[in-house]
Regions:
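Short beta-strand segments enriched in hydrophobic/aromatic residues
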Residues: 53-55, 67, 112, 127, ...
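Short glycine/threonine-rich loop-to-helix capping motif typified by GTGT followed
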Residues: 205-209
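Outer-envelope beta-barrel architecture signal
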Residues: 57-61, 115-121, 187-189, 211
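Residues on the lipid-exposed face of transmembrane beta-strands in outer-membrane beta-barrel proteins
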Residues: 47-53, 106-110, 123, 179-183, ...
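Transmembrane beta-strand segments that form the barrel wall of outer-membrane beta-barrel proteins
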Residues: 191-203
Length: 229
């Protein structure tokens, strides 16, 4: 559905050039665009490096490192004649955010077959660190719309204690040592055991580290009774 463009009467220009009338539900979409200013920029970088080395047949060491970094900055301004802003004399908002994530993992794994026996094992270390910061501000009651959100401190709401602002910061770190062994006999009987020793800044003060073991047994019935077919 499209809305028509309305030109205001030259005898009553007080509500802005294109509005038919303020405070009602039919406003010119062109005017709404002119009464609103949105700007933003987002920068993001991500990169990773992988390396592996085969020491002997069946034995390999690997390492992986990665980083993700992102920054965002946004600004919005709603003019005094914008439909939802009438009476506020302009509203300005700004938002800034920065995020960073660093990861590292190193492993050594082995795989070998001895007759009817097959063995696989892996051990490793992993590290992950995240950090984020954000800031936001909002102010209104401006004397003019000329400066938009670039003059956010001059809104009258700040002087009256009605403006708002906020900020946040969070850092998280995760470190883990892990290992896993898998064994099967004739692809029929299966065994697996794993353990992970993990420390996290998100854990409680008295429990920064935890051990997480797991064991499983299996039997492939289809393999056991294949000869009966």
């Amino acid at each position: 559905m499209y809305k028509r463009q309305y030109e205001t009467s030259g005898n009553n220009p007080q509500y802005g050039k294109y509005f038919f009338s303020p405070g009602i539900d039919y406003h010119n979409p062109v005017a709404m665009l002119e009464q609103r200013d949105d700007e933003g920029i987002r920068k993001e970088f991500s990169g990773s490096v992988n390396a592996s080395l085969r020491i002997i047949d069946g034995l390999k060491i690997s390492a992986m490192g990665a980083i993700i970094e992102r920054s965002e900055r946004y600004g919005h301004y709603y003019g005094r004649y914008y439909p939802v802003n009438i009476g506020n004399n302009g509203t300005a908002e700004t938002y800034n955010d920065h995020y960073k994530n660093k990861m590292l993992e190193a492993t050594i794994d082995y795989s070998g077959t001895f007759g009817d026996h097959k063995l696989q094992a892996i051990a490793g270390y992993s590290f992950s660190e995240e950090s984020s910061e954000s800031y936001d501000q909002m102010n209104y009651k401006f004397d003019t719309d000329i400066f938009g959100f670039h003059n956010i401190g001059n809104g009258g709401a700040l002087k009256e204690g009605l403006a708002s602002m906020g900020s946040s910061k969070e850092d998280n770190r995760l470190i883990a040592f892990f290992g896993r062994v898998m064994y099967n006999y004739k692809e029929k009987y299966l065994f697996s055991a794993s353990v992970r020793y993990e420390g996290s800044s998100r854990f409680g003060d008295n429990h920064k580290w935890g051990t997480f073991p797991a064991v499983s047994l299996g039997w492939r019935i289809s393999v056991s009774y294949t000869h009966l077919r």
